């Protein structure tokens, strides 16, 4: 213990950052010097499963953020599985932004209401990775600017803008964005086409976020290498640019007037393709005239369900369109 006490606070904080947060907080009983050192780790993971939920969790997070003072926080994760007031969550987010945080992960169940993402998040110059889950409303301002953001994860986020496509506005303010994940939520007001446009985006995942009233999705991502789309097909894809696509995983579903034609045409450069449901095989067969020559495809995986007979109708078409195919995996 004497040898450890001889180390500087910076080194001790680095050592504590290698422990779980529960283990790190247990060191606070060692001495007065150690009482708050756990709070000065550059990486903070505040989880109600480790420190208790409800009011005790709120008090604990408040205490940690007060103790850190002006000390920089590089990465912080706040997770709470017990419902808490959204006012606390908003206050915490604003607080950590003032610490120059680079990685922010918020996963909290709110009480009866859904909180708003604070406007300060949309002008944070230090954020590199942002993850928001469990439901927030968001109003993207016209002055949004996230110059350092590379990873954006949105789960059950409901955009409220009615004068524009808020996701399009948000992405246009992220000049170095590389990874985008959207799960559930609502992208935009009914009058606007969904737009995913980014010249830097390399990985895109869209899951269970479609609503019947939406008309179309524009995907303009010339640098995209990985696409995972597990959702309803909209009425149309007005524009699709997937020139650099290497791998695609599709689990498509149809409504009465869905049209995936341009999405299917956009797969022409894909090298690895996974069709993750029988409905996907059915959709590709129904729109088989849109299937391009897959000149680079070397691995094809097809999963099925009760609609497995569509696989055998679709398979000869895909084989004919894939001159360089090396591996075929069929899971029935």
From Swiss-Prot:
This protein's superkingdom?
A: Eukaryota
Q: Which InterPro entries match?
A: F-box-like_dom_sf, F-box_dom, FBL60-like, LRR_dom_sf, LRR_FXL15/At3g58940/PEG3-like
Task: Identify the residues that the record assigns to the F-box domain, covering every copy.
Answer: 2-49
Q: Which Gene3D superfamilies match?
A: Ribonuclease Inhibitor
- Known Pfam families for this protein? F-box (PF00646), LRR_At5g56370 (PF24758)
PANTHER family, A to Z: RNI-LIKE SUPERFAMILY PROTEIN
Please state what the protein is called.
F-box protein At4g22280
Tell me the lineage of the source organism.
Eukaryota, Viridiplantae, Streptophyta, Embryophyta, Tracheophyta
